[in-house]
Amino acid sequence: MGSWTSDPAPPMAEVFNSAVAAVAIGAAWEVGLLDAVKDQKKVDVFQFAAENDLDRPSVQGLVAALAVVQVVALEQNTVVAGRQLEEAYRTKSLFHWLCLGSGGLFSRMQYVLRNEHRTGDFHRRDPAAIAHACHDINKQYFDPAFWAAMDGLDYPVQSVVDLGCGSGQRLMQILDRHPQASAIGIDVAGPAIQVAARDAVARGFGNRLVFREGDAREVSYRDEFEHVDLLTCFMMGHDFWPRDKCIATLQRLRRVFPAARRLLLGDATRILLDTPGGQQAVRNGTVPIFTLGFEVGHAMMGVYLPTIDEWEGVFAEGGWRCVKKHLIESLSLSVVFELEHA
């Protein structure tokens, strides 16, 4: 081996170090270190560990990982902002989604690659961590387009259902802005909606917001759906696919929510894998943040990710009409569709 020098790390060392740092960014956000450095400017490592009941050597390791990629800088035992802190903070939930929420999937890549293992419930992710990350992803990337669509509605919202509601934060924001409205959140992840229900009660929405555990793709008519006039669905529309199933799901939503005047459907779309010659396709040297993890992760789970063109090709058969499309280019290539009954 060569001697230790101050030369830049070779490419594979950068890849290795970045893999550790990616986990560290998600963890640092969850334990509050990123916010502490951002807000306080200087954080004593030992004091932070003691105040938050964290193992001191592990926190020192966490800080070292962040320092290697210049998210923070370490001055003796004091952590200060590094050159990449602002960008890391802006994208923190993407790292959390990848490494904490989906870590159980990626750490078993060698297992899920084998067809002999791809039966039944062959992969694991952390639904509560996914919900936590998706709340911030929605806030950072989808909210501007979502609220533009909400502000453009030409009717007063009375009853809203969020399909794949996760933490329920979107519904609570809607209820804040529309005090006359009530809401229902539907999600297949029981742990996520248990947290959401407790949060809703704590924030005073207990009599206006309820949560139902269930698969949004298989939802059946209930009396409480009769007057729902707004449907929202973010970061789970790809679960409707492949095409025939997506059309069937859209038709089902059309029947189950007969009074819905708008369906706001937002999701990231496929731009990397199996997109030869596609108008929005990217190549290896231009892959944006999130795209690789999002597309590879869903490929391993056996979930089909549609392109924008494929989405636009199912609305009519599904019983909906697209009245407006909001593109979001800061998160892979994402979109918010405004749909109405055809």
Swiss-Prot record:
State the EC number(s).
2.1.1.-
Q: In which pathway does it act?
A: Secondary metabolite biosynthesis
GO BP: methylation
Q: Name the domain of life this protein comes from.
A: Eukaryota
Listed A to Z, the keywords are: Methyltransferase, S-adenosyl-L-methionine, Transferase
Q: Does the record's keyword annotation contain Methyltransferase?
A: yes
Q: Which GO terms describe its molecular function?
A: methyltransferase activity
Q: Which Gene3D superfamilies match?
A: Vaccinia Virus protein VP39 (3.40.50.150), Winged helix-like DNA-binding domain superfamily/Winged helix DNA-binding domain (1.10.10.10)
Entry-linked Pfam families: Methyltransf_25 (PF13649)
Q: InterPro entries given for it?
A: Methyltransf_25, SAM-dependent_MTases_sf, WH-like_DNA-bd_sf
Cysteine pairs bridged by disulfides in the record: none
Q: Which residues form a coiled coil?
A: none
**What family is reported?**
Belongs to the methyltransferase superfamily.
Function, as annotated: Methyltransferase; part of the gene cluster that mediates the biosynthesis of the unguisins, gamma-aminobutyric acid (GABA)-containing fungal cyclic heptapeptides with the amino acid sequence cyclo-(D-Ala1-D-Val2-L-Leu3-beta-MePhe4-D-Ala5-D-Trp6-GABA7) for unguisin H and cyclo-(D-Ala1-D-Ala2-L-Leu3-beta-MePhe4-D-Ala5-D-Trp6-GABA7) for unguisin I. Within the pathway, the methyltransferase ungE' is probably involved in the synthesis of the (2R,3R)-beta-methylphenylalanine residue incorporated by the module 4 of the nonribosomal peptide synthetase (NRPS) ungA'.
| Record-given protein name | Methyltransferase ungE'
